[in-house]
């Protein structure tokens, strides 16, 4: 299966031949990267790059939750707006969101208006603050260092792994929501905990060093 974060797994327009040059670029990219410039920049600059900044990891975890049931490009196009309305993803502030603020967000057509997902922002912020070392915990599921995979094509890329299942179980126990194993594996891919650029992608050579 294709990676969940960074792809529209429902799209039938991406050929199995996988990586290919896009928009005149000499780069060869992963099979899931479509021709949207925002998507291309995300693939080339963010996806799979090891992330250890607590604030950015928290933001990414929330964005993963927003993506549930949707394509990643849907969230990516709204990321800047989410940063505006969610106080720059400042965890302490989001932990104090009031019910009235959540209801106000439900009126904003520029974001995904899902009450359960918006309530999860507050729930997950509080759970995050309760962790002594959230970054250490998240990276512990891959032994503290990126797990470099060597997948040749989309059929080899998993949607769930034992590490993702362990992360999901631990986060749920800690009080997080919207952290099922599929979401957790997508999170691991995006944050560089696992490196899942396929071997024919130019980013593979860079990130597998």
Segments and roles (model prediction):
Residues 1-4, 14-16:
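Short hydrophobic transmembrane-like helices used for membrane targeting/insertion
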């Amino acid at each position: 299966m294709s990676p969940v974060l960074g792809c529209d797994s429902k799209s039938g327009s991406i050929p199995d031949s996988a990586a290919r040059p896009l928009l005149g670029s000499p780069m060869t990219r992963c099979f899931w990267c479509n021709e949207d410039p925002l998507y291309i920049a995300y693939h080339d600059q963010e996806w799979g790059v090891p992330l250890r900044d607590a604030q950015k990891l928290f933001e990414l975890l929330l964005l993963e939750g927003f993506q549930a049931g949707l394509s990643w490009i849907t969230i990516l196009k709204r990321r800047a707006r989410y940063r505006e309305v969610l106080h720059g993803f400042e965890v302490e502030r989001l932990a104090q969101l009031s019910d009235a603020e959540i209801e106000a967000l439900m009126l904003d057509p520029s974001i995904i208006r899902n009450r359960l997902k918006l309530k999860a922002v507050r729930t997950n912020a509080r759970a995050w603050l309760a962790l002594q070392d959230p970054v250490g915990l998240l990276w512990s599921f891959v032994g503290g260092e990126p797990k470099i995979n060597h997948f040749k094509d989309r059929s080899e890329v998993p949607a769930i792994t034992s590490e993702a299942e362990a992360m999901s179980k631990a986060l749920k126990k800690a009080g997080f929501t919207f952290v099922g194993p599929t979401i957790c594996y997508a999170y691991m891919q995006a944050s560089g905990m696992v490196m899942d650029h396929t071997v024919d992608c130019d980013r593979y050579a860079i990130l597998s060093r």
